Design a protein with these regions (language model features):
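A short, Lys/Arg-enriched amphipathic alpha-helix followed by its capping loop at the start of a domain
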Residues: 14-29
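Short, surface-exposed alpha-helical segments at coil->helix boundaries
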Residues: 16-19, 76, 103-106
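Active-site nucleotide/adenylate-binding loops and adjacent lid/helix of ATP-dependent enzymes
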Residues: 2-8, 29, 79, 85-86, ...
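Glycine-rich, highly charged phosphate/nucleotide-binding loops
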Residues: 35-55, 70-73
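Short, charged/polar "capping" segments at the starts of alpha-helices
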Residues: 12-15, 39-40
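Redox-cofactor binding/interface segments in oxidoreductases and associated redox assembly factors
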Residues: 60-61
């Protein structure tokens, strides 16, 4: 039996559907919010996640709420460290980073020759105007 963690800042109908279908496949399901995840970087311990994540086989990442840059990057770090710990991660940090950031998504599409709408990105509307990929 696999043990799967569903990690989300908001457990809604989608988390319930994922849980239902995982249980139908005979998986043990643990639902956690990001604020329930603890890291302990003690030099005497190899495992640094809290006990809820010690023995999971996979993680299904759902919803990351808004927050400060530090809060969001910490949540992404949790996800990166799960993968680095050899835990299969659905919706990996890399995937989230590539799809949530519209500038990065557009850039990846352009680099790979995939058409997308013309895009302009402003860093500071008063001082600087940067055209992203020359209007693609």
């Amino acid at each position: 039996m696999y043990s799967i963690a569903i990690i989300s800042d908001l457990h809604d109908w989608h988390s319930k559907e994922i849980e239902y279908h995982l249980k139908k496949k005979n998986c043990e399901v643990i639902k956690l919010s990001f604020n329930e995840i603890e890291l302990n970087f003690s030099k005497n311990k190899k495992i640094f996640f809290n006990k809820n994540l010690h023995h999971i086989d996979g993680a299904w990442v759902r919803f990351i709420n808004s927050g400060s840059l530090e809060e969001i990057t910490t949540k992404l770090t949790f996800i990166h460290l799960l993968k680095d710990s050899k835990v299969y991660t659905h919706n990996s940090a890399e995937t989230i980073e590539k799809t949530v950031d519209k500038v990065r998504t557009t850039g990846i599409l352009k680099i790979n020759g995939i058409d997308s709408p013309d895009t302009i990105v402003w860093i500071n509307k008063k001082d600087k105007k940067i055209k992203f990929n020359s209007l693609l």
